[in-house]
Swiss-Prot record:
Swiss-Prot/TrEMBL keywords: Chloroplast, mRNA processing, Plastid, RNA-binding, tRNA processing
Lineage: Eukaryota, Viridiplantae, Streptophyta, Embryophyta, Tracheophyta
Protein name: Maturase K
Location in the cell: Plastid, Chloroplast
Keyword ATP-binding: no
TM spans (from-to): none
Molecular function terms, GO-annotated: RNA binding
Coiled-coil zones: none
Major localization listed first in the record, in broad terms: plastid
GO cellular component terms attached to this protein's record: chloroplast
Pfam families: Intron_maturas2 (PF01348), MatK_N (PF01824)
The keyword Chloroplast belongs to this UniProt entry's keyword annotation: yes
PANTHER family: MATURASE K
């Protein structure tokens, strides 16, 4: 960011909050579509003259787009006439896709500048292990043992586009950019009526920015009320801008609670609440207070309806008791398992038995969901019986084995934290036999004859990678014991979901 600061005049943008002129600068387009900087967009760059043959950037397309934006006065076009606007006709979806990427990059500039300025002069502790997906499970294992009730909320999406514009208006005070942002959103909705593929106009970075802005606004309000009880608040919570009518709406929510719960308003100050957000859901955990969970359920419904004007159905807010119900959390079925124990105690000459209960944080594999995902990808049928992967028979034998080993290794690493490994062994069995059937089909042979000719070397490849990693972590004596296969292992290098793991 410092490298391009003088070239793009970010200081001037920061002082005046004028982002709209950046849409007319060719250098910003180069920055937006640079493969080294734009890591969120895994697709090919669309700033190519011919994406199939020539992979050089074309500034000619950028100049054409800038000229079109100069010629069109889109700020005065009514919403009802957007379908007749020649600026983004059906034949010009190419230009809209470029503008959606550019808009996400430009609007991120003030956030990046404010984030850098807030961390200046501060020494931040680097905790790379906390970036792992598995890092949350040791926290839950330590905290949820003392909590009984969990409130699970599915974060609703805003129905009307003006809600997204209003959310962004609290942070971007450039009227021209906001009008242009509104115009792009309505154009995208109008394109849904055309007979085109959704992937042709979908830009991940643009919609990630919209979703994160929506969630950031919700969490900033929630953390403002519950910052003392939130143990997982974001480190960038200091980067919050002022909001229009923010405190007025806070007072409105307080009045709602005072009128409905005049004598029990103190639950807002309860410190024994933990908050976790994942995959469009959030959970709140508390101890021995079902009434508190019911109040928070009522609170969430009023929060979304009063502040965000979004109708939140009560069915999307579930109260679960961990000792009886299971919680679907990041691909695991989590619950609290109560194991009764009888302890023999002796005091002087008297011997007596003490009955106690041991609480264990249990994590299981959702085997039915994973088999459904494997069946969808043609690795097995709906009953879990392996079948050959016919679409891979054109590849070489080494490439086929490498694909199956990679998938098996990813699933094995992710679900290594399961309390019971029986379902994990079943998944490995499906992938191994599917690999053998695929190779046998390619060579026009039977499974028995192919295994007899190849030997046991094929099946050993599925265990080599996992065995090397585990042997580096644990001593050889412990690695050779059976306890390793019964205990849970959390890997702190998992930064993203595998496609087959993310089966929601």
């Amino acid at each position: 960011m410092e490298e391009f600061k003088g070239y793009f005049e970010f200081d001037r943008v920061r002082q005046q909050n004028f982002l709209y002129p950046l849409f007319f600068r060719e250098s910003i387009y180069v920055l937006a579509y640079d493969h080294g900087l734009n890591k969120l967009n895994r697709n090919r760059s669309i700033f190519l003259e011919n994406a199939d043959y020539d992979k050089k950037y074309s500034l000619l397309i950028v100049k054409r787009l800038i000229l079109r934006m100069y010629e069109q006065n889109h700020l005065i076009i009514p919403t009802k006439d957007l379908n007749h606007n020649p600026f983004f006709g059906q034949s010009n979806l190419f230009y809209y896709q470029k503008i959606s990427v550019l808009f996400a990059v430009i609007v991120e500039i003030p956030f990046s500048l404010r984030l850098v300025s807030s961390f200046e002069g501060k020494q931040l502790q680097k905790s790379y292990n906390l970036k792992s997906i598995h890092s949350i499970f040791p926290f839950l294992e330590d905290k949820l043992l003392h909590f009984n009730y969990v409130l699970e909320v599915r974060i609703p999406y805003p129905i009307h586009l003006e809600i997204l514009v209003q959310t962004l208006r609290y942070r971007v005070k450039d009227a021209s950019s906001l009008h242009f942002f509104r115009f792009c959103l309505y154009e995208y909705c109008n394109y849904k009526n055309f007979d085109i593929q959704k992937k042709s106009i979908l830009n991940p970075r643009f919609f990630f920015f919209l979703y994160n802005s929506h969630v950031c606004e919700y969490e900033s309000l929630f953390f403002f009320l519950r910052k003392r009880s939130s143990h997982l608040r974001s480190t960038s919570s200091e980067v919050l801008f002022e909001r229009i009518l923010f405190y007025g709406k806070i007072q409105h929510l307080v009045k709602v609670f005072v009128n409905n719960f005049p004598s029990t308003l103190g639950f807002l100050k309860d410190p024994l609440i933990h908050y976790v957000r994942y995959h469009g859901k959030c959970i709140l955990a508390t101890k021995d207070r079902p009434l508190l969970m019911n109040k928070w359920k009522y609170y969430f419904v009023n929060l979304w309806q009063s502040y965000f004007f979004v109708w939140l159905q009560s069915q999307k807010v579930n109260i679960n008791q961990l000792s009886k119900d299971t919680l679907e959390f990041l691909g695991y079925l989590s619950s609290l398992q109560l194991n009764p124990l009888v302890v023999r105690s002796q005091m002087l000459k008297n011997v007596f038995l003490i009955e106690t209960v041991r609480i264990k944080f249990d994590t299981k594999i959702p085997i039915s969901s994973i088999i459904g995902s494997l069946a969808k990808e043609k690795f097995c049928n709906v009953l879990g019986h392996p079948v050959s992967k016919s679409s891979w028979t054109d590849s070489s034998d080494s490439e086929i084995r490498e694909r199956f080993v990679r998938i098996c290794r990813n699933l094995s690493h992710y679900y290594s934290g399961s309390s019971k490994k029986k379902n994990l062994y079943r998944i490995k069995y499906i992938l191994r036999l599917c690999c053998v059937k695929t190779l046998a089909r390619k060579h026009k042979s039977t499974v028995r004859a192919f295994l007899k000719r190849l030997g046991s070397g094929l099946l050993e490849e599925f265990l080599t990678g996992e065995g090397k990693i585990i042997s580096l972590i644990f001593p050889r004596s412990y690695y050779a014991s059976k306890r390793l296969y019964r205990n849970r292992i959390w890997y702190l290098d998992l930064l993203y979901f595998n496609d087959l793991v993310n089966h929601e």
